Design a protein with these regions (language model features):
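Extracellular structured ligand-interaction cores
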Residues: 23-25, 37, 74-80, 88, ...
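Catalytic core of Fe(II)/2-oxoglutarate
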Residues: 86-173
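A generic short-segment signal for beta-strand/edge and adjacent turn/coil regions
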Residues: 44-52, 59-62, 80-85, 139-148
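A structural signal for well-ordered alpha-helical segments within the folded catalytic domains
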Residues: 2-10, 77, 109, 119
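Signature of the catalytic double-stranded beta-helix
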Residues: 1-72
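Short, hydrophobic/aromatic alpha-helical segments in well-folded domains
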Residues: 11, 65, 78, 94, ...
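Short, structured patches in soluble enzyme cores that scaffold and shape functional sites
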Residues: 30-32, 81-83, 95
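Proline-centered turn/helix-capping motifs that create local helix->coil transitions or kinks
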Residues: 16-19, 84-88
Length: 173
């Protein structure tokens, strides 16, 4: 359904003026509340024989931004789809480069998508609600998973302690 979607494939072909597009990866991102923007970043490029499966991400990005490995670079179009609307959670991106003003895709995001080159375009997630009066601090080992009590809620646990609970409808998908 997702990797072979006709409109997404057509958008990828048009974006690169290409004749062939081969879908290869599907990620699903669930985002609970974050009160600050995530860092602006680029995703991980792929080169002939080199991907994040066998090469550190910092090295892949260095290879990409140096321009020295362009002839081995595999062009990738990324389709980011939003399945629901939540408080906040917009997508800020710099299609004209980091020296220009960003654009933002926010509000009314359910069942929308953007197709582009997220391996070469800086982007970031804007704050996602629901917003609390106090920050919820967790470590990098925190996990988001369905609650095991049958409530249908999702919980963020950190070190075995529940730090945040929310219905799935409030999680950015």
């Amino acid at each position: 359904l997702f990797t072979l979607h006709e409109r997404v494939t057509a958008a990828a072909l048009e974006f690169y003026d290409a004749e062939v597009a081969v879908p290869h990866t599907l990620y699903v991102t669930l985002m609970a509340a974050i009160e600050k923007c995530g860092p602006a970043h680029t995703d991980n490029p792929v080169f002939q024989g080199r991907s994040r499966a066998n090469t550190p991400m910092w090295l892949l990005r260095t290879m990409f931004w140096s321009g020295l490995f362009d002839r081995w670079s595999i062009r990738q179009a990324t389709s980011i789809w939003w399945m629901n609307d939540v408080e906040g959670g917009g997508f800020r991106y710099w299609p004209d480069g980091p020296d220009h003003s960003p654009r933002s895709h926010a509000e009314g995001m359910a069942n929308t998508a953007l197709v582009g080159d997220n391996h070469g375009m800086f982007h970031q997630v804007e704050p996602v609600g629901p917003f609390a009066a106090e920050p919820r601090l967790v470590t990098g080992r925190a996990e988001l998973a369905p609650a095991d009590d049958g409530s249908g809620d999702w919980v963020v646990t950190d070190g075995g302690e529940e730090r945040f609970r929310t219905p799935l409808e409030a999680v950015r998908v």
